[in-house]
Amino acid sequence: MTALRLGSLFDGIGVFPLAAVRCGIEPVWASEIEKAPISITKRHFPDMAHLGDVTKLDGRDLPPVHIITFGSPCQNLSQIGNRKGLAGEKSSLFFQAIRIIREMREATNGLFPAIAVWENVPYALQHINDVMNRNQLCIAPP
């Protein structure tokens, strides 16, 4: 049986890869731009590729993974933030993850990723349903 493989966008300190390893999932690559979190992740996952800025990645060029996780910036989605939602400068980076997922799916004829997991603040849910439906990213029973 082939092990599931994971890619992590907006990786931070590597919480998704850490959880993945504990479930028998192999973290393959991560994208993060902050040096301190990258150093932490490199210490725990020395073999995981660090790919840098999500805005410079192309999903067609990334090693295909079964699962893509992402915790895009929440500043514009948080109740204590400016509440510009996904139109805000930082929180709109969410769409970079969607772009990368779509590119990988196109390059693999829809095989990868099979699962996308987004982590964010509770207030984000008020902004996301219409976006997910418009982008045909979530097809689930009501």
Residue map of PLM features:
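Conserved active-site and SAM-binding loop architecture
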Residues: 1-142
